[in-house]
Amino acid sequence: MKQAIAGVVAFDEEITVMIVYPSIAGAPGGIGKILGRLFNIQIGIKPLTVGNLIALASAPLCAGLWIGRVLPMNRLPIIGTLSKKLGLAPQRYRITTKAILSEDAFDGSTVQETIALDSFDEIEIAVDAGQSWYDCGDLIFKQAGAVTGRLESVSRPESFKAACIKSQMSFVGVKQAI
């Protein structure tokens, strides 16, 4: 059985530590962020606020956006071509024992971005107004103040940041020991 902890497996092996799917706040065209801003409207008496009523009415649209972010719609013959043109290719963020990857959500066959675990020393979380309702944010990776990578609309960014930092500390510690 393979362990998903840097330093426990052989240093040259790459094992998955954690996988997270982006929130629908990152949907193309900014529609997810627009909906998030609308859902945050607190006019009214809770739980019957304007934002909650808009969220209820737009549930089918949000379900469609979520399905488009997770399921491999880009692999279907006719819908796939359209989804690629609209930027609806589903993706996921995966922490391994060597890097943080932004890749194809279905099978990880296409990697869009790679952030090596030794290429950052700080991670910032930037939460846009349209992202706060979804409990998501952008993770900005920095090395000596310079941006080395960015992951957009990460669900529950605090826990993903903690996992990134733990993996980075383990990787760098093992690398220095070897």
Where are the language model's segments positioned?
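N-terminal basic, Ser/Thr-rich segments that initiate or prime the first beta/alpha elements at protein or domain
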Residues: 1-178
